[in-house]
């Protein structure tokens, strides 16, 4: 409950930032955080530096042997956010700020800072080795590219579109380079069970059967079953006991919407969906206003940030180290219709 109240507090704080110059300053600070987390993540993924940077995922649990538990050496980016999934969510939000600021801000120094930060975050996101990182990052680039293409038709200025296209190509180059060097691999299932069994010590070591079904639908089925058994009020925030009794293998579904339904129930789920729809409507108006130069690039940035977070949330979970960024961005969306200072 305190966590939820804290999130709404961050949302309210975002709503109070009604001056565009202050939104830009806040964006500078947020992008700086993203660049820092990206640098830490990259260092965690480099064998020579990984041993000196704290990381819960330096070694991944792989099973049991006669000598006890066995682990494999891995080099996975988490930043200082505890898990690769949290890093994926945070960098999705912040990359949207960095890319839009790089495209549309008037100051050259800020453009350069955002461009460097974006490159770092792109590399770190890929090195997180999980689906939501690739999905969220890809959404940021694709959505921003579409907006830039439409904007260029309104403003007759092709520079932002060309810059976004170049950024998209550079991101593709970074991905190709990491893939070619065998530094890119998706390790979602191993990371999920290592996080649950080894880091948090709350559930088992893996699936309870031999199915080859992709891990996400497998977990979603468990989550929906639990939600159906506790449809109105949910299980509450600590749903481990309910999950254990129902025979599920883990206490999280790795789908933020299913997690919300199973833990908070149908009423809170419906209210949250209404809130998200209202926010998306405001986002559409912000982007439309940006096309006609009625508001600055921060409106476009926060809209892209919220939308891309919602996309990657289908394969991610809420976390105290990542969700605050979403709520701040959502508050900034609503700030455009608040009383302007």
Where does each model-flagged region fall?
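TM-adjacent membrane-interface loops and short helices in multi-pass inner/ER membrane proteins
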Residues: 186-190, 198-250, 257, 264-271
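Extracytoplasmic/periplasmic ligand-binding sensor domains
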Residues: 26, 182-195
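Membrane-water interface of transmembrane alpha-helices in multipass transporters/channels
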Residues: 319-324
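Conserved glycosyltransferase catalytic-site signature
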Residues: 29, 132, 216-217, 254-255
């Amino acid at each position: 409950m305190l966590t939820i109240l804290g999130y709404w507090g961050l949302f309210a704080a975002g709503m109070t930032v009604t001056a565009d110059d202050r939104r830009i300053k806040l964006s500078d600070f947020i992008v700086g955080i993203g660049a820092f987390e990206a640098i830490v993540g990259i260092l965690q993924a480099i064998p020579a530096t990984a041993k000196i940077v704290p990381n819960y995922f330096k070694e991944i649990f792989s099973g049991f042997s006669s000598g006890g538990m066995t682990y494999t050496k891995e080099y996975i980016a988490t930043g200082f956010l505890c898990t690769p999934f949290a890093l994926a969510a945070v960098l999705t939000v912040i990359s949207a700020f960095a890319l839009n600021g790089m495209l549309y801000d008037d100051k050259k120094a800020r453009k350069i800072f955002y461009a460097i930060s974006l490159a770092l975050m792109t590399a770190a996101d890929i090195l997180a080795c999980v689906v939501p990182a690739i999905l969220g990052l890809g959404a940021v680039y694709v959505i921003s590219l579409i907006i830039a293409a439409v904007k260029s038709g309104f403003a007759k200025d092709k520079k932002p579109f060309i810059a976004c296209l170049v950024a998209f190509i550079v991101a593709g180059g970074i991905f190709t380079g990491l893939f070619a060097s065998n530094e890119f691999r998706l390790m979602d299932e191993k990371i999920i069970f290592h996080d649950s069994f080894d880091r948090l010590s709350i559930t088992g070591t893996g699936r309870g059967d031999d199915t080859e079904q992709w891990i996400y639908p497998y977990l979603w089925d468990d989550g929906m079953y639990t939600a159906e058994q506790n449809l109105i009020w949910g299980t509450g925030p600590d749903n481990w006991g309910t999950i254990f009794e129902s025979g599920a293998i883990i206490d999280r579904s790795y789908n933020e919407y299913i997690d919300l339904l199973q833990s908070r129930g149908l009423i809170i789920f419906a209210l949250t969906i209404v809130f998200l729809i209202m926010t998306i409507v405001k986002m559409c108006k912000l982007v439309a206003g940006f096309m006609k130069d009625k508001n600055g690039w921060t409106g476009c940035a926060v809209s892209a940030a919220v939308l891309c977070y919602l996309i990657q949330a289908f394969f991610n979970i809420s976390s105290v180290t990542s969700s605050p960024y979403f709520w701040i961005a959502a508050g900034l969306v609503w700030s455009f219709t608040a009383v302007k200072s």
